[in-house]
Amino acid sequence: MFAAVLDTCVLWPSLQRDIILTLAAHRFFKPLWSIEILEELEFHETRKLIDHGIPSQAAELRAQRLVKKMKMHFPKSVVL
């Protein structure tokens, strides 16, 4: 299985992220990312949700939950 670093520009569009992570879950490849990439993803996901009218606290919680689920489902994906 090959590995690929997924930057925020790949992970941030929701539909694109869902498709790519579904492929990873089916072991087509191993996703890799850094803590910085996940932090950037969380920031941009929060901003997007706020821009769509979600209250800031709820937006932050949803973005945090997204990153937490990614870490849970792909625990060996964080690289330095």
Per-segment meaning from a language model:
Residues 3-4, 8-80:
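Active-site-proximal, substrate-binding regions of enzyme catalytic domains
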